[in-house]
């Protein structure tokens, strides 16, 4: 009986230990999927897309990257040939994120300058996507370093975005909750854009639907601008009264 009890105790201890060391799904790195379409079928993503986070510790450039699909079938097809479906998606992300990318030097070698992100030559450098976000580097060697540790180098991009967009951020209220922004708002990065929100809970909501969040941001910014400049009057000027004699 003692042997049986000992075996049961050992089995329970082992099960508990294994339960505590079950592999956890990777945390999302970077931002939520910023495109409106599925990378496999290219159909628009509905209100309830299938959300997957790549679990591949052997490839840090992909591990933790969120992908959104139109269906579970598309998610399964994606796993057969990730590179095939990510290539055009990455190219689209580069095109969309370049205009807002901060005017900073290479994040790996800060002494090396890059072309203006808004210039015609901006797309000809080493532009890579990690965690659904653009990182520009001066050379292929630096690009490889970014792929090996995306979190480290995305943090440098974040600093550049805050320095570039934070000072001129036009809103005083949170686009998610409508609450006034605190003196130190929570920064959310969607692609190369900064969204300031009031609380960490608002930050989570902002990433749930990044396209909708950016649409709200753009609408709020547009509402701050004058509706239209007054058109010059086409009426004839009033006739001046003659001077009294």
Give the location of each predicted region.
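Intrinsically disordered, low-complexity terminal tails/loops enriched in metal-binding residues
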Residues: 18-245
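Bacterial N-terminal signal peptides
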Residues: 7-17
């Amino acid at each position: 009986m003692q042997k049986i009890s000992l075996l049961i105790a050992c089995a329970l201890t082992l099960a508990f230990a294994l339960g505590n060391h079950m592999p956890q799904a990777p945390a999302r790195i970077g931002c939520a999927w910023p495109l409106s379409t599925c990378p496999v079928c290219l159909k628009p993503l509905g209100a309830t897309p299938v959300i997957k986070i790549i679990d591949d510790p052997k490839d840090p450039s992909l591990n933790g990257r969120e992908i959104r699909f139109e269906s579970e079938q598309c998610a399964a097809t994606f796993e057969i040939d990730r590179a095939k479906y990510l290539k055009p998606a990455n190219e689209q992300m580069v095109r969309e994120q370049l205009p807002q990318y901060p005017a900073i030097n290479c994040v790996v070698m800060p002494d090396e300058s890059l072309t203006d992100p808004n210039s015609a030559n901006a797309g000809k450098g080493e532009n890579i996507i990690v965690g659904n976000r653009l990182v520009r580097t001066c050379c292929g060697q630096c690009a490889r370093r970014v792929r090996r540790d995306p979190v480290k180098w995305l943090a440098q991009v974040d600093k550049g975005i805050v320095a570039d967009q934070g000072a001129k951020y036009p809103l005083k209220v949170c686009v998610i909750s409508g609450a006034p922004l605190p003196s130190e708002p929570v920064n959310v990065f969607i692609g190369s854009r900064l969204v300031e929100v009031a609380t960490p809970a608002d930050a989570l909501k902002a990433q749930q639907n990044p396209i909708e969040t950016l649409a709200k941001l753009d609408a709020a910014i547009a509402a701050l601008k004058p509706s239209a400049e007054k058109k010059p009057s086409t009426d004839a000027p009033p006739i001046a009264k003659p001077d009294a004699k």
